[in-house]
Amino acid sequence: MSDFSASDPNQPPPVAGQGGSPPPPPPPNLSPPPGYQAYSAAPTPVSGSLSRVSGLSKAVVILAAVAAVGSVVTAITTPGAVDSARQFRDGAISESRFLDDYTAYGLTQTLQGIGTLATAVLTIIWLYRIAKNVRVMGRATTWAPIWAVFGWILPPVLIIIPFLMVREMWKASNPDVGLGAEQWKQGDENPLIIVWFVLYGIVPAILTVISSSNALSAGFEQDAEDVARVLDESGSVTILGSIVSAVAAVVWILVVRQLTARHVAFTNER
């Protein structure tokens, strides 16, 4: 009679091979099931069809040009808005006159922001397609396609992610490296991507810190006097930021055109 008893639930059941017959041996000629793939530390290539990027890149270029024009207009109109703010602070014009001038100035900034936002949305789709295509082509990239989305919406301190991703997509789209080869990882760099990152990421981050300190000093509930003071004190930063944004948009247009041409040659898009 076995020592295991249902009346003693704290006692474990007997283990095969201990006090009983040994377990049967595995059947010979075992083979993995169909579709089985061994674990690999490398990123898994994406299956599916290639997506077209050339037409989308043209839309990105057009919207980036619109954003650049908006930045130039903002840079041109800012001195007038700053002058109006100073006159209001000195009592030379009324509050209603200053607010009218500021509303017109704010409209140009709004239009610039809309152009920039539209460019960002299409850029995300464009970069996602490129990241997916290179994996369909067998490139084991570090940055998965989903990072084309999250890389732009994560906190600003992680703005380096889009730079690293665009940089890797440039290398992965090298048409001179055959499929299955890994030499693309040591491929040539595009210096324009670095210039774009400095103009789009680093310089605006510094300017944002400077302008934010002026805005926060006025508090969240600002009256016309507070708005005029902030505009007066941060006018030069706004002008510089608009110029940098315009140049960054132009550089981005060049990056998009060059990366698209390289990627189209790699995927043989027609």
Task: Pin down the residues of each PLM region.
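Intrinsically disordered, low-complexity Pro/Gly-rich regions
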Residues: 1-48
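Hydrophobic alpha-helical transmembrane segments
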Residues: 101-118, 202, 232-248
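Aromatic-anchored segments of alpha-helical transmembrane domains
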Residues: 201-208
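Extracellular/periplasmic helix-loop-helix junctions in multi-pass membrane proteins
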Residues: 209-246
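Membrane-interface extramembranous regions at the lipid-water interface
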Residues: 29-72, 80-99, 122-150, 160-201, ...
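All-alpha RGS (Regulator of G-protein Signaling) helical domain and cognate RGS-like helical scaffolds
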Residues: 153-156
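Intrinsically disordered, low-complexity, compositionally biased regions/tails
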Residues: 21-24, 39, 110, 205, ...
